[in-house]
From Swiss-Prot:
Classification of source organism: Archaea, Methanobacteriati, Methanobacteriota, Stenosarchaea group, Halobacteria
Protein's name in the database: Riboflavin kinase
Segments of this protein annotated with the region Riboflavin kinase: 99-234
InterPro entries referenced in this protein's UniProt entry, alphabetically: ArsR-like_HTH, HTH_MarR-typ, RibK_CTP-dep, Riboflavin_kinase_archaeal, Riboflavin_kinase_CTP-dep, Riboflavin_kinase_dom_sf, WH-like_DNA-bd_sf, WH_DNA-bd_sf
Required cofactor(s): Mg(2+)
Top EC class of this enzyme: transferase
Transmembrane annotation, as ranges: none
Keyword Chaperone in annotation: no
Known catalytic reactions: riboflavin + CTP = CDP + FMN + H(+)
Residue numbers binding CDP: 108-113, 212-215
Length: 234
């Protein structure tokens, strides 16, 4: 049974940061426990245990070979480092960092219209977002750089939309993140990225909700490039 993330403390995060600085956030790197122990001022056994804990927590992928091991950060590992980064920004009063995602407008499967309009969600949108969203989502296919940057979104403070159930089925929770949608000189400020816990979309796709139909207010068509900006909570 894998260890829970509670097994990951500051020492393990220091090891995670080191392998990320060595390039493990973008591709697998080869490292020995003796090399890691020198950098962390710990014994080889301690360094090995820290990597094992990171792997058990889902922060690292490891492949042990005869002369070392190949390691790479998982999405959860990247998210953990982004959270550390965001906390340091809060400590030092730097809330200027903006997460910027770019992609192209695309047509969805129409599921957003159905789910957004359900009363169990709509009531929470009105209370927690401060508006009643247009029944549908704006779908964006992220470019390669933004797909990698997207992990930073989960380190921001989101607005929780709770799951609920009716007589027939249960509906999953979601998290909303305040965002600005930018197209040339036009901007839609009252918008949110919505990240459902249950979704058919992968990490390359983004869903946005807003009070108005963004395709109309920004005169959007499929294939247009668009930018989404998110800021840390002030």
């Amino acid at each position: 049974m894998a260890e829970s993330t509670t097994a990951v403390g500051h020492d393990e995060l220091a090891a995670l940061k080191f392998v990320a600085l060595e390039g493990a956030h973008s591709e697998p790197i080869k490292i020995s426990c003796s090399e890691l122990s020198d950098r962390l001022d710990a014994s080889s056994q301690t360094a090995s245990r820290r990597l094992q804990r990171l792997e058990a927590a889902g922060y690292l992928d490891r492949d042990v070979v005869t002369d070392g091991q190949w390691v790479s950060l998982t999405k959860a590992g990247e998210t953990a480092l982004h959270k550390e980064y965001t906390q340091y920004q809060e400590i030092f009063g730097d809330n200027s960092s903006v997460v910027e995602l770019t992609g192209t407008v695309t047509s969805g499967m129409g599921e957003g219209r159905h789910y957004i309009s359900l009363s169990g969600y709509m009531k929470q949108f009105r209370e927690r977002l401060g508006y009643e969203p247009f029944p549908g989502t704006l779908n964006i296919d992220l470019d390669d750089d933004s797909t990698r940057t997207r992990v930073a979104v989960s380190s921001l403070t989101g607005i929780q939309i709770d799951g609920w159930e009716d007589d027939e089925r249960t509906f999953g929770p979601a998290t909303c993140y305040p965002a600005e949608i930018i197209l040339a000189e036009q901007t839609a400020e009252a918008a949110h990225i919505i990240v459902p816990e249950r979704t058919h979309h992968d990490e390359t796709q983004l869903e946005v909700i807003a009070p108005e139909r963004l395709r109309d207010s920004l005169e959007l068509t499929d294939g247009q490039r668009i930018t989404v900006q998110l800021k840390p909570k002030e």
